[in-house]
Amino acid sequence: MLKIGSHVGMSGKEAFFGSAKEAHSYDANTFMVYTGAPQNTRRKDISDLRLEEGFEFMKQHGISDIVIHAPYIINLGNSVNLDTYSLAVDFLAKEMERTKAFRSKYLVLHPGAHVGAGVDAGIKQIVQGLNEVLTRDTDLYIALETMAGKGSEIGRNFEELARIYDGVKYNDRLRVCFDTCHTNDAGYDVVNDFDGVIEQFDKLIGKEQIAVFHINDSKNDRGASKDRHENIGFGTLGFDAISYIVHHSDFIEVPKILETPYVSLPNEKEKSLPPYRYEIEMLRNSVFDPQILEKIQNNR
């Protein structure tokens, strides 16, 4: 069965219970959430997040295999500022514990950035950090995200991810989150030759290592290294290419998570609406609706 959902929020009094309800409102059967704000280390206590109510709601509505995303501030690749690196390692370990509390198997992580020290130094530092947090007994997977190649990001190509795998002692606890926008922006031809791209990935890492897909169109041409997401069917990837990926027989059981932009209202630019219910429906049915953005704006 196709597993498809989106990023959802987690805030206010309903907390995770509200996250599950938001996912259900999009007719999703999976979703992704941050355990707190992605830009900082402030976190509510697990006991305040209404997890059990969320789990019960998920059970009642056929939602499973949720994904946790690590915050952006974790940069394991920083060998220039070791205080930043130490913070990243410590906070990643805490996020792993929170991921288990959310009953998720997958913690998606941006591998890191070398901040000018060079790719080799960045990869060495990432490997060191992962070796500090992963043990024989780790009972979840860290899913390294494919990156667009913006700035000094590590993970802009499969070779860099493979080098991380090669250096990590307990790399059976690693997986990959394949982002369609990022791989396009990094230079891979996921539009015309997705199977060829996967063949490259399979030779270097193994396609069975892909545990999560981030499903996004892109505002950029292939190889732009910019990482700007677009709504499904309105970017340079196009609906047909994305639908092909979503329904690919090799990955039908892998959770597909939408991270596409909210849709702005024409006369109220400060307000925007989530597109996920509409995009999920389009992708489930494999039928593109070119009027979908207008429908989102009119059905608020």
From Swiss-Prot:
InterPro entries noted in UniProt = AP_endonuc_2, AP_endonuc_F2_Zn_BS, Xyl_isomerase-like_sf, Xyl_isomerase-like_TIM-brl
EC no. given is 3.1.21.2
Q: Which reaction does it catalyse?
A: Endonucleolytic cleavage to 5'-phosphooligonucleotide end-products
**Listed cofactors:** Zn(2+)
Q: Which GO terms describe its biological process?
A: base-excision repair
Q: Which PROSITE patterns match?
A: AP_NUCLEASE_F2_1 (PS00729), AP_NUCLEASE_F2_2 (PS00730), AP_NUCLEASE_F2_3 (PS00731), AP_NUCLEASE_F2_4 (PS51432)
Q: Which residues bind Zn(2+) 1?
A: H69, H110, E145
Q: Cofactor: bound how, per the entry note?
A: Binds 3 Zn(2+) ions.
Molecular function GO labels: deoxyribonuclease IV (phage-T4-induced) activity; DNA binding; DNA-(apurinic or apyrimidinic site) endonuclease activity; phosphoric diester hydrolase activity; zinc ion binding
| Residues at which Zn(2+) 2 binds | E145, D179, H214, E259
Record key words, sorted: DNA damage, DNA repair, Endonuclease, Hydrolase, Metal-binding, Nuclease, Zinc
User: What CDD domains does this protein's entry cite?
Assistant: AP2Ec (cd00019)
SMART domains xrefs: AP2Ec
Listed binding positions for Zn(2+) 3 are: H182, D227, H229
Q: What class of enzyme is it?
A: hydrolase
Q: Which NCBIfam families match?
A: nfo, PRK01060.1-1
Q: What's this chain's function?
A: Endonuclease IV plays a role in DNA repair. It cleaves phosphodiester bonds at apurinic or apyrimidinic (AP) sites, generating a 3'-hydroxyl group and a 5'-terminal sugar phosphate.
Family under the similarity heading? Belongs to the AP endonuclease 2 family.
Its protein name is: Probable endonuclease 4
